């Protein structure tokens, strides 16, 4: 999200937050 963060897990990333 814009005020979230990117969590890298293996070969993919998850964009969390609003």
Curated annotation (Swiss-Prot):
A GO molecular-function annotation: ATP binding
Its EC number(s): 2.7.4.6
Cofactor(s) needed for function: Mg(2+)
Superkingdom assignment: Eukaryota
Catalysed conversion reaction: a 2'-deoxyribonucleoside 5'-diphosphate + ATP = a 2'-deoxyribonucleoside 5'-triphosphate + ADP; a ribonucleoside 5'-diphosphate + ATP = a ribonucleoside 5'-triphosphate + ADP
Keyword 4Fe-4S: no
Keyword Transferase assigned: yes
Keyword field: ATP-binding, Kinase, Magnesium, Metal-binding, Nucleotide metabolism, Nucleotide-binding, Phosphoprotein, Transferase
Top enzyme class: transferase
A GO BP entry: nucleotide metabolic process
Coiled coil start-end: none
Family: Belongs to the NDK family.
Summary of the function given for this chain in its UniProt record: Major role in the synthesis of nucleoside triphosphates other than ATP. The ATP gamma phosphate is transferred to the NDP beta phosphate via a ping-pong mechanism, using a phosphorylated active-site intermediate.
Protein name: Nucleoside diphosphate kinase 1
Natural source organism: Pseudotsuga menziesii (Douglas-fir)
């Amino acid at each position: 999200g814009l005020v979230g963060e990117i969590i890298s897990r293996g070969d993919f990333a998850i964009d969390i937050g609003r």
